[in-house]
Amino acid sequence: MINTFIKKFPESSSCLKTLKECSFDIDNNVFLTNSPHPAYNYDDIKTKYASNIPCKNDCLSSVDSLLEIDGKLLWIEFKNKNITKSETISIKRKASESLLIFIDVTKFDLKQVHDNSEFILVFNKNKNPALLKREQNKKIVDYQGFNTITDNLAKLSGDHYIHFGLDSLELAHFKRVYTLSSSEFENFCHSHHIATQ
């Protein structure tokens, strides 16, 4: 699917970077992954796309990166900050508008893109104290192994918990949605044969 996008929007071919570069937080001078795996910097693609429409760059938002693994599009947003409700709204907007750009360029229908797309939010666990507190409480309240049992059942069923209210993206936009800490993302990369260092 990415090849179709590049063919129809050749300016985007210059936006190929690494996941590490796409994860860079300029405000804090930090990377959320060290992966050298090639990925398209979708923010750069969005800027090139927006230069062709009247509203220019400020009317669109986008996720940080896009890559294709085993025929699946992986849309990735990196967040090195506390994810508030307003930040969640911003993330949903970025995801939606990223898909709109892709669909406009490729002319694929939404169902086709949905069925071949996964969204990943990679976040800094240390900057999300409510999530850390919930995990600490989970360990304290683990009534006779209840949390361990439910976690194992979720793993067996292929389910996963989606943080920050982003589960609605899985219903409408993407086949799967993941919210992963930086270390969980490294594990995800290993299990999906994405280079990590």
Task: Describe each region flagged by the PLM.
Residues 23, 30, 37, 69, ...:
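Short, flexible loop/turn elements at secondary-structure junctions
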Residues 11, 137-197:
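Polybasic (Lys/Arg-rich)
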Residues 65-67, 71-81, 98:
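Conserved catalytic cores of phosphodiester-cleaving nucleases, focusing on short active-site segments
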Residues 81-135:
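Catalytic cores of nucleic-acid endonucleases
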Residues 1-58:
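Acidic-basic catalytic patches of nuclease active cores, encompassing PD-(D/E)XK
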Residues 53-55, 64, 106-110:
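Catalytic micro-motifs at enzyme active sites that drive phosphoryl/nucleotidyl and oxygen chemistry
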Residues 40-42, 50-52, 92-100, 154:
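Short linear motifs at secondary-structure transitions and domain/linker junctions
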Residues 61:
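Beta-rich catalytic cores
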